A protein has these predicted regions:
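Structural motif
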Residues: 36-41, 100-104
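Short loop/turn segments immediately following the C-termini of beta-strands
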Residues: 30, 95-97
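Structural signature of eukaryotic scaffold interfaces centered on beta-propeller domains
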Residues: 2-20, 72-88
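Surface-exposed loop and turn segments in beta-propeller and other repeat-based domains
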Residues: 58-71
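Beta-propeller blade signature
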Residues: 43-46
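Hydrophobic alpha-helical segments, chiefly the membrane-spanning helices
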Residues: 119-123
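Conserved small/polar residues in nucleotide/adenosyl-binding loops
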Residues: 106-111
Length: 123
């Protein structure tokens, strides 16, 4: 795609609109307030309309503890790094607002099957 740069983001909203559509979506699933005593998890959803598993949860990654209340996840590299070849979106940072745990999730080499890389404890 002409005009797009080499890093993990985009220089402008119009450049992002011209980019290829996402094929996977990561979303937080929490049990806070439900009475269910299970760990929160990150769900990977297939959003590629050409895929056989389109619109399905293709992977669930449970957190190690109960009651984290996962919130406001983000990438290790933001869109302002669009001109930096050395940057890539390899990790998702997912904090627990009730536990103060920060989960570092590895999205490469298999973005469908997230791995826990590091789970620093609040203790």
């Amino acid at each position: 795609m002409e005009g797009l740069c080499c890093g993990p983001g985009y220089a402008s909203p119009s450049e992002a609109i011209r980019a290829p559509n996402e094929k996977l979506l990561y979303t937080i699933a929490i049990y806070t307030g439900t009475g269910i005593q299970k760990p929160d998890y990150l769900a990977t959803i297939d959003v590629d309309p050409k895929s056989e598993s389109y619109s399905k949860v293709v992977h669930r990654l449970e957190m190690p503890g109960i009651g984290d209340e996962l919130h406001h996840m983000g990438w290790n590299a933001c869109s302002s790094c669009h001109d930096d070849k050395s940057m890539s979106r390899r990790y998702l940072l997912v904090p627990g607002v009730r536990s103060n745990n920060i989960c570092l999730l590895y999205t490469s080499p298999s973005p469908r099957d997230l791995l826990k890389s590091r789970m620093p404890s609040s203790a």
